[in-house]
Regions:
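Active-site glycine-centered loops adjacent to acidic/histidine catalytic or metal-binding residues
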Residues: 26
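Histidine-acidic metal/acid-base catalytic patches
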Residues: 17-21, 31-155
Length: 155
């Protein structure tokens, strides 16, 4: 965040030049940076896959093309919730495929305070970040268990 690797195209270029570079996949900033539209095109999906192939850490926050952090239970954000869950599933599966059995994947529920979070006219958050973090954690634990029950999943 707030760095040279905040720009998706620049980051992809850096990865071409330094393929050994490991990242923390903060995908929400790429969604806003490139103003991704849903449904996502194949090109954008391939860009995110490249980021995930080079990531040893994943940040858990859901964005849409206008906002880097959206409420996960609002109906208008459900398409993005599913997109991010699919990306997390892919990122975790890719990480598991290249990591040793005793390795640790870091998944950080990175939910920021106001003004990162969406607020009302009084500056109060519209959601409960702690509860959202617990929900995201539960989703990721389920994804992990699903992948664990299907070893060797083809990506």
């Amino acid at each position: 965040r707030d760095s040279t690797l905040n720009d998706l195209y620049y980051t992809l270029r850096v990865l071409e030049l330094m393929p050994e570079l490991r990242l923390c996949a903060d995908l929400s900033h790429f969604v806003v940076d490139r103003e991704f539209r849903e449904p996502l095109c194949e090109r954008d999906q391939s860009y995110i896959r490249t980021i995930l192939e080079h990531s040893d850490c994943i940040q858990g926050r859901i964005a849409n093309r206008e906002q880097v952090q959206v409420q996960i239970d609002f109906p208008q954000h459900q398409a993005w919730v599913e997109i991010f869950k699919d990306w997390w599933r892919l990122g975790i599966a890719l990480w598991r495929a290249r990591s040793h059995n005793d390795a640790t994947l870091r998944f950080l529920c990175a939910l920021g305070p106001p003004s990162y979070a969406i607020t009302d006219a009084r500056g109060e958050e519209l959601s409960d970040r702690w509860q959202e973090a617990l929900t995201i954690r539960s989703w990721v634990e389920t994804i992990w268990q699903q992948l664990e029950s299907k070893p060797g999943v083809t990506l």
